[in-house]
A protein has these predicted regions:
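Short capping/connector residues at structural and topological boundaries
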Residues: 28, 161-164
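Acidic/polar helix N-cap motif
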Residues: 72, 121, 184-185
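C-terminal regulatory/effector modules of DNA-binding transcriptional regulators
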Residues: 165-227
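Hydrophobic residues in alpha-helical segments
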Residues: 18, 94, 117, 140, ...
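Short linear motifs at protein or domain termini
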Residues: 1-96, 101, 201, 205-227
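Mobile beta-alpha loop/short-helix "lid" or hinge segments that flank ligand
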Residues: 54-59, 154, 166-168
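Conserved amphipathic alpha-helical segments that form helical-bundle/coiled-coil interaction surfaces
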Residues: 79, 100-161, 172-179, 188-198
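Alpha-helix N-cap/N′ positions at the starts of helices
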Residues: 63, 86, 108, 169-172
Length: 227
């Protein structure tokens, strides 16, 4: 496993929180609060936020500081099309390079998502879904493409939203992908992952988000950054 600096670790935790909706769109991110929650100094938090600003996960707003940005109207379709294009490529390369141990790792991530359906929050599930996808994409060993995909996830309108019936369907789609992977059907597995992305997009367009009560959402869990 590649060495990850404190800045890298903080950035990844913040990405997960934004994707999960722990920090809803419009939330102001305070460096001191994040540093205290993660048990680090201000410096890696500041550097991580600079990285996330470049990726589009946060945006600097005059007199307000760094906020989780709102969705750009009309951009969702283009973002979806780019996701399909790039994530298909990453998945194909990841599947070609995958070892049995990698498949076990994805299975473990899927098991955590399943466990969270009964005991976890929506934020927990969305964060674990993010880990599942990027655990897969990192196996492609295409860091520049991976970076573009991170940017696209930041711009996608699903951040912080849950769509009617999506939870069960997501689990079934992950399961289909894994089953094809374990059966040695590389082409089928890649198409299953693409179908999964397209299914999420179709559900978002057809069903719309269910109501999420921001006031009832738990505070971010304290995470400890390793030196």
């Amino acid at each position: 496993m590649a060495f990850r600096t404190k800045q890298d670790q903080v950035a990844e935790i913040l990405r997960e929180r934004i994707i999960a909706g722990t920090y809803p769109r419009g939330t102001k991110l305070k460096q001191s609060q994040i540093a205290e929650e993660l048990g680090v100094s201000i410096t890696p938090v500041r550097e991580a936020l600079h990285t996330l600003e470049a990726e589009g996960y946060v945006a600097g707003v005059s007199h307000k500081g760094l906020l989780v940005p709102e969705v750009v109207p009309g951009a969702a379709t283009e973002v979806f099309e780019l996701r399909v294009l790039l994530e298909r490529e990453l998945t194909a390369r990841a599947v070609a390079a995958m070892t049995p141990r990698d498949i076990v790792g994805l299975r473990e991530s899927q098991a955590r998502i399943v466990a969270l359906t009964g005991s976890g929050t929506e934020q927990d599930m969305r964060a674990e879904n993010y880990r599942f996808h990027f655990r897969l994409y990192e196996l492609a060993n295409r860091p520049q493409t991976l970076q573009f995909v991170r940017v696209l996830w930041a711009k996608y309108p699903f951040i912080g939203q849950e769509y009617v019936g999506r939870r069960e369907k997501q689990l079934a789609e992950h399961e289909r992908f894994l089953a094809l992977l374990e059966a040695g059907d590389a082409e089928g597995a890649v198409q299953a992952l693409v179908d999964h992305i397209e299914s999420g997009w179709a559900g978002m367009q057809a069903g719309g988000p269910t109501e999420v009560e921001a006031a009832s959402e738990p505070r971010p869990k304290r995470r400890v950054i390793r030196a």
